[in-house]
Amino acid sequence: MSNALPNLEHYWMPFTGNRYFKKNPRMFKEASGMHYTTYDDKTVMDGVSGLWCCNAGHCHPKIVEAIQKQAETLDYATAFQLGHPTIFAMAEKLVDMAPNELTHAFFTNSGSEAVDTALKIALAYHRARGEGHRTRLIGREKGYHGVGFGGISVGGMSPNRKMFGAMLPGVDHLKHTHNLEHNAYSVGQPKWGDHLADQLTEILMLHDPSTVAAVIMEPIAGSAGVYIPPVGYLNKIREICDEHGILLILDEVITGFGRTGSNFGSDAFGVTPDIMTIAKGMTSGTVPMGGVLVKEEIYDAFMTGPEDAIEFFHGYTYSGHPLAAAAGLATLKVYEDEGLFENARKLAPVLEEEIQQIKGANHVIHISNFGLLGAVELNPIEGKPTARALSVFRECYDRGVLIRTTGDTIAMCPPFIATADDVRKVVNTVKESLEAID
């Protein structure tokens, strides 16, 4: 492949400082296993699984083979009134993996679409049961639920909201659980903070619980900075939702598919949602795919009227795409056959031990970890939020390791094919980079 750069002018890049990038481009041309190859033939270790998604590493031969074979056999088939065997097999496999009460899968093309689909399912479910007055939605401060209008409305990332003006009406937000005074440098789940779930009751009493359709949150708030839920917090949220007939949606786009060491974050924290959103790791990042898993009673509420009538007026041109389904099935088989979730569990203590040693390094004010997820929060430069973390990102890249920044937090989530030495290299590169910057 040529080392010459393409014309960079016309591509409007997402979540990127386009002007800076085009003056200082970082371009990948190949990937394999734990590593990218840059356009100028440098090797970069992937310490963030692409974008929280390449759990089986890059270009896994069995996943590549499945995609190639599917492209040669059936390249596309609409899911509207038609089907193909691979997507039904994918749905069955997902239900087998999910908590027992989640029995049906609806397919999308991304986590953002999965969230907007989940919100529509929640609203339509209540209408189908004669409770159309349940229209309010409750998210969380610093929650990230993709970039659709539904997702940014229930989400709590202010930069993702303020550019666009009006959001969906009737949305409230719980406070987030991140508290440096009480939880700085917590190892695993913080002990302080389960009482913050009681704010949900306060919001419900303000509006009348019978007007609320759903509560949505991430088991671990990944994009906010890897905020781990306090012990008992999610259980309390579940109990309050049950008490008032409110659906609980858990956004498992990041935490799903082994990232916590369990199949899903729901399993790790012992809380089963009514609706679960998934994406990213379900195809190990190879082909865009997302999905929504729901309980039996939610699916059944739609199965009324004439048998040949459309039950849910929603879907996408590429819902259940054959290539995505083939990639997904192959990915789930790789996870199982190669014991990758078990490897993630084995690597979690290594990540924990290494990342906690960063305490005391330049500018560090907090460290968090759970499963194969870790984050280091930095004291921001006054008047220049995000600048310090971006400096670490660039320094790590120059040293041959890719990490992720969100605000002034550095996130690490290596692929499950990593070795203990790989994990140590990622964390040590972050530590060395912190020592190298101002």
Please give the residue ranges for each predicted region.
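Conserved N-terminal phosphate-binding loop of PLP-dependent enzymes in the Aspartate aminotransferase
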Residues: 1-438
